[in-house]
A protein has these predicted regions:
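Conserved P-loop
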Residues: 1-75, 119-130, 140-143, 163-165, ...
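Conserved AAA+ ATPase core "coupling" helix
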Residues: 136, 142-163
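Sensor-1/coupling segment of RecA-like P-loop NTPase cores
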Residues: 104-126
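Catalytic-core regions built around general acid/base machinery
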Residues: 22, 99-107, 130-134
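Walker B catalytic acidic pair
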Residues: 87-89, 115-116
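Conserved ATPase-coupling elements of RecA-like P-loop NTPase cores
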Residues: 89-100, 120-125
Length: 195
C-alpha cells in the first residue's frame, strides 16, 4: 500500500534539500519521480525546486485551483511515476491534500509532501492542517534556534530586522524575511509589551 507522507519543519531546516535527495535516490535506481511546487514560490524561478545549498530540479507548478490528481494521472500516463514529491505543501488547499491521498490510495503511488507547519503568527497553514490530519506518516525535520534549542516557529521581519506581528499569512521570502526560533524566543519576539 502506498502512503501519504508529510515532512514538516520551520524555515531553513533543509526540507527542499531532503526532497531533492530523495528524488535523486529514486532516479539512481531507475525510477521516475514527479516533482511539484507552489507557483507562488518563485524564489529560484517558476517551475523549479531549489535548496539553500544550491541544489535545483525542474518541477510542475500548482496553484490553489490545480486539480492535483488530474495533473498526476496525466504525467503517469506519459511515463509511469514511482513517487510524487510536493514541495511547499503548506500552500496546498484542503481539497488538494485529499486528492493527493487518493493518488496514494487509488493509484498506489507514494506521495511525499514537504512544508511548513505554521505561519509567522503560529497558525497552521490549511494544507499543513489537512496533512497533519490525514497523512499516513508524519515526520518532523529539525532545525535550531540561535540559542541551540529546537526551532519550531518562525518570525517575519521587515527590511530593518523589525519583527512583524500582523499581516497576510502568505508572503514569500527567505532568510532575509524569516527567522526560525524555539517557542520561547518566538514568544519573546512576538511580545508587543502587553504580554
Amino acid at each position: 500500500m502506498a502512503k501519504l507522507y508529510f515532512s514538516y519543519a520551520a524555515m531553513n531546516a533543509g526540507k527542499s534539500t531532503i526532497l531533492l535527495q530523495a528524488s535523486h535516490n529514486y532516479q539512481e535506481r531507475g525510477m521516475h519521480t514527479l516533482l511539484l511546487t507552489a507557483r507562488l514560490d518563485d524564489r529560484v524561478g517558476e517551475g523549479k525546486i531549489g535548496s539553500r545549498i544550491g541544489l535545483q530540479a525542474p518541477a510542475l507548478v500548482f496553484s490553489q485551483d490545480t486539480d492535483m490528481k488530474t495533473v498526476i494521472v496525466a504525467a503517469h500516463d506519459q511515463q509511469p511515476v514511482d513517487c510524487v514529491m510536493v514541495d511547499e505543501a503548506q500552500f496546498l488547499s484542503d481539497w488538494q491534500v485529499w486528492q493527493l491521498s487518493r493518488v496514494a490510495d487509488d493509484l498506489l503511488i507514494p506521495v511525499m509532501c514537504y512544508g511548513l507547519r505554521t505561519d509567522f503568527q503560529g497558525n497552521l497553514f490549511p494544507g499543513s492542517a489537512r496533512l497533519l490530519a490525514i497523512a499516513d506518516v508524519i515526520r518532523e525535520i529539525r532545525t535550531i534556534c540561535h540559542c541551540g534549542s529546537k526551532a519550531t516557529m518562525v518570525v517575519r521581519q521587515d527590511e530593518q530586522g523589525v519583527v512583524i506581528r500582523e499581516g497576510a499569512q502568505i508572503e514569500i521570502g527567505g532568510n532575509e524575511r524569516y527567522i526560525s526560533l524555539c517557542r520561547k524566543h518566538w514568544c519573546e519576539a512576538m511580545d508587543d509589551g502587553t504580554g
